[in-house]
Amino acid sequence: MDIISAIRELCKGDKGFENMFDKKKSGGKLASLTGGDRDAELFEALLHGKARSALIEMINDAYNFKEYAVTAHGLLMKDGLSAMDAKRALEIFFTAFGFPGYRDMDESRVAELTDGDSSFSTEYKGEVLNGKEHGIGARTCYSHGKWCHYDECVWINGVMNGYLSAKDLELSAFEVQKIGFVIDDHEVGKTKCFSGEDEYYDDGLKFNVI
């Protein structure tokens, strides 16, 4: 299994994303899933080494992820990784969780899924596995036939986990764009919002692991 598929497999289920940061619960599992691939070792260095704190800050302020990436890269090198290996560790995280510039889809797995009725319905187009949203995709929600919400994210077994680019239609008239990070369908940390010429943050529950 490739490293991206392995990470998403590890994140399946209740608190899967959070448990990924727990070495007792996840340590060695990526190596097992990937057959001992070097990428698994690099990713675990990001999760469990000096860069861990910068990674958590990045999750809680995803709009400014590039700033935290610079810090994390330096901390990975302090842990003994080369500049190229440190860059690769971050690329793996960005790809697994759909950050801008890292959203390539496997076209062989792209499909459309619909759900709901005339009062509320959803349309999903993106990567699908075993009949569920799994991978990069976009979902549009409709209220009585009119769009009301849009999410572009990474889905893991039907649940959003990753960098979120969303749009809301508030009061049936005002479009609000939101950029942040989602864990188990819940926005975490600071979500950057744009409404007309206004910019502001919505503060959600911070993601934190010991």
Language model segments and positions:
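Charged, amphipathic alpha-helical regulatory modules used
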Residues: 1-106
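Glycine/tyrosine- and acidic-biased, solvent-exposed loop/turn segments at the edges of beta-strands
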Residues: 105-210
